[in-house]
Amino acid sequence: LVQAKETDMHGIRGRHIGVIFQEPMTALNPVHSIGRQIGESLMLHRGMNTREARDAAIQPLQRVRIPAPEQRVDEFPHQLSGGMRQRVVIAIALACHPELIIADEPTTALDVTVQAQILSLLKDLQAEMGSSSILITHDLGVIAQSCDSVVVMYAGRVVEKAPVRELFANPRHAYTKGLLASIPQLSSMRKTKLPTIPGQVASIADFVPGCRFCQRQGVRGQ
């Protein structure tokens, strides 16, 4: 894909790979209706005209469980709540039934209740469509709830990868251990200081050979 021509990428984006962005208000175009934004990929990849794409956009809205989709399809992003806007972003990503779904922090801007609903929806849709998914997140709770395997990255490099259960039970890398240790525990004493990872992320100009986390843990990685 890195070496693919732009003309080839036009046929891949939306059709074979769908992307769900983290901030629905900025991901959606405020001057276009919901139906037009969903229909764009249908016109590009399915050869539909504007009217056909608008009518076909109702089905993705039904799939993501938006009530009254026949009405919502002609509304604009500002008329929807944050949770509904995120469902529209998901509908756009899934309109052409892609084989791979990339979800970039899909619940960051949502409250906890809506977050749980969106994660459950994504899981159901993935099973329904038989798609694979890549979830990009900093939320370890979301990872534990939604993923089968996990890749931990630090400063642009993979530092650890493992099945989710194994990673939470037996983290190997110091950065992973630091992340897990920083999760607040209900059993902790009220005035106990929360564990933190010391230091700052190094500048790209200061990276040293080996493990990029070594400057924060005091031990050079092999």
Specify the residue positions occupied by each region the protein language model found.
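ABC ATPase NBD coupling module
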Residues: 1-18, 36, 44, 50, ...
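A short, surface-exposed alpha-helical micro-motif characterized by mixed small hydrophobic
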Residues: 143-145
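Conserved ABC ATPase "signature" region
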Residues: 52-71, 180-181
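A short, proline-enriched helix->beta-strand linker immediately N-terminal to the Walker B motif
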Residues: 95-99
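Short, glycine/charged-rich "phosphate-handling" switch motifs in NTP-dependent
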Residues: 149, 161
